[in-house]
């Protein structure tokens, strides 16, 4: 059985000044006087936190590599070290650690002098979850994440980060890092210490 409830009749004062209407808008009126907190993107930019997991980059060889650990990995995979080029030693640890390994396309090339270099390093960001597992797995601190979060593109092809793009993002990040020292990820030495005690079976260079 439906119970009918009689509405309370409005007084003449409530009818004239729309008091019920004003009561309904009190939340709106209250917040209308508060300072706005909305960031009007893209006209306004935000500053990501220190541990923000943004677009990926490659650190290049610039003389700041943690020694002797970096040289040990270079000798292990017989890598040719070139100043200004990626630190990657083609160990494939990033691909093995990734929940979606299909996003990585990594190839090494053997030079006539017997040394090896990374020739292909593509990352399909359409498949990436930005979990950072690949960054943690990198033994030479080559792969890392920056504060870049504007990664929209018009085509699927533009969503693939090539080796050249990763190196360029890395150079730009290092230059900005000098001006913004507070926004720094885990230090190179700390990561190398973590991997120094890891007894994971490594693949042979010819298997990479």
From Swiss-Prot:
Residue ranges of domain 4Fe-4S ferredoxin-type in the record: 79-109, 119-148
Annotated catalysed reactions: a quinone + NADH + 5 H(+)(in) = a quinol + NAD(+) + 4 H(+)(out)
GO terms for cellular component: plasma membrane
Binding, [4Fe-4S] cluster 1: 88, 91, 94, 138
Cofactor: [4Fe-4S] cluster
Disulfide-bond pairs as recorded: none
Cofactor remark: Binds 2 [4Fe-4S] clusters per subunit.
EC code(s) of this entry: 7.1.1.-
Residue ranges crossing the lipid bilayer per the database entry: none
Membrane topology: Peripheral membrane protein
EC primary class: translocase
Pfam families hit by this protein: Fer4_7
Subcellular localization, as worded in the UniProt entry: Cell inner membrane
Binding site for [4Fe-4S] cluster 2: 98, 128, 131, 134
UniProt keyword list: 4Fe-4S, Cell inner membrane, Cell membrane, Iron, Iron-sulfur, Membrane, Metal-binding, NAD, Quinone, Repeat, Translocase, Ubiquinone
Family: Belongs to the complex I 23 kDa subunit family.
Function of the molecule: NDH-1 shuttles electrons from NADH, via FMN and iron-sulfur (Fe-S) centers, to quinones in the respiratory chain. The immediate electron acceptor for the enzyme in this species is believed to be ubiquinone. Couples the redox reaction to proton translocation (for every two electrons transferred, four hydrogen ions are translocated across the cytoplasmic membrane), and thus conserves the redox energy in a proton gradient.
Family annotation (HAMAP family): NDH1_NuoI
Subunit structure: NDH-1 is composed of 14 different subunits. Subunits NuoA, H, J, K, L, M, N constitute the membrane sector of the complex.
Protein name: NADH-quinone oxidoreductase subunit I 2
Organism: Aquifex aeolicus (strain VF5)
Taxonomic lineage from the root: Bacteria, Pseudomonadati, Aquificota, Aquificia, Aquificales
